[in-house]
Amino acid sequence: MTSTHFEASYLIETPLAPEAVAEVMAGEQSCGTFTRVAGETDDLRARARAQVLQVQPLGTVERPSLPNAWLARQGYGAGAHWQRARVRVAFPIANVGANLPTLAATVSGNLYDLGEVSGLRLECLDLPPDYRDQFDLPALGVAGTRRSIGAVHGAMVGTIIKPNVGLSAQQTADLVRQLCDAGVDFIKDDEVSANPAHAPLRERIPAVMRVIREHRERTGKWVMVAFNITDETSAMLRHADLVQQEGGSCVMASINWCGLSGIQSLRRHTPLALHAHRNGYGALSRDPMLGMGYQAYQTLWRLAGVDHVHVHGLQGKFAQPDAEVVESAQDCQRRLSAAQDDRVLPAFSSGQWAGTVPATWAALQSDDLLFMAGGGILAHPDGPAAGVLSIRQAWAAVREGSSLDYYAGHAPELGRALQFFGKRG
């Protein structure tokens, strides 16, 4: 990779020659169209045209992955050979500059609608470090989040406000008090609870932060709360200001619905940690021949300056296989910048409890992560405090190389969790 270009890798499917399709992709997303036009000089093409770096054939399939009217009009149907290939393209940085929405439009955009393909997926996005540094950085990232909550080592244990919706502002604050007393490091709103009529942020933020301040005064422990401020941009900025005025340290947004520009504006407006909830990512990712892989996805959002990004959880309740969850977390833990630590905190959630800790540790060999459990804490038979302790005991066990069953011999909270949740698993 050169300092003048960024590179993107794709998985494509087509009945045409993959090499020819790769050239169409490069032209469509730079200075070309379906035919050469006046003004498209050789000099302009040399400066502005994207370059195909590699086409790797992957074999054929019997039928197209996606419908395509353009290919049907060309006569491609039964009997066609649908070829798959990996394509790598280099794009001139000068075409885009430090413009995040245009970067996203360049590496994806109209490529998904190309007539020449029956499948296209953006898999990877690689940026020269100097180019990455033209974009926003996380405010806290991994190390800053640890400092904020006072967790020098070990996984950061979090939970989610449940019931998701329906609690009043005061009821939410009362639940937060219970969760703080249980010993969590982090509490977040659910993605469907932002500014509801029964618990508007103007009431919920002060009520919850009063509890957080009282807990710190009583115990010395600071608990980070991610208030869901998802909304149109100006409202998000107002809500973030209120969180900051009340002494809070984090806000959450449903990034796919707020958009890259909205999150950039939020990042540049507030020093608070941005907890990026990826709900809706499945629409971009679940079909293997369409959408966007997590490496490219998290790269774009990290350029918007988020601090934490959801990756789902191992052995969890959602559709992603464990291998994808692990790869997603590893992507978050890799630096994009050579000059600064721009790693973001992978947020594990969905069906997590003490019993999913060994697989998480085995896959990552790291506890630089946010391990969030709802039922795994709140439904522990001995109460939420025992639920939190069981998760911390599980992390202590894997760090010292012990099995959970062995460690549970002197950790009754873990033993009860294994007995209770294990029967359900």
Q: Where do the model's predicted regions map?
A:
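Alpha-helix-loop-beta-strand connector modules within alpha/beta enzyme cores
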Residues: 29-30, 44-48, 53-60, 199-227, ...
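Extended, intrinsically disordered, low-complexity segments
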Residues: 299, 383-425
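Active-site mouth loops of central-metabolism enzymes
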Residues: 11-16, 155-173, 223-235, 280-292, ...
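Active-site-adjacent beta->alpha loops and helix N-cap segments on the catalytic face
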Residues: 138-149, 193-215, 233-236, 255-271, ...
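Catalytic alpha/beta core domains of metabolic enzymes, predominantly
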Residues: 238-241, 246-373
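Flexible, glycine/charged-enriched surface loops at secondary-structure junctions
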Residues: 37-39, 186-191, 195, 215-223, ...
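N-terminal capping/small domains of soluble enzymes
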Residues: 1-181
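Phosphate-binding glycine-rich loops and their immediate beta-loop-alpha structural context
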Residues: 159, 166-193, 199-200, 212, ...
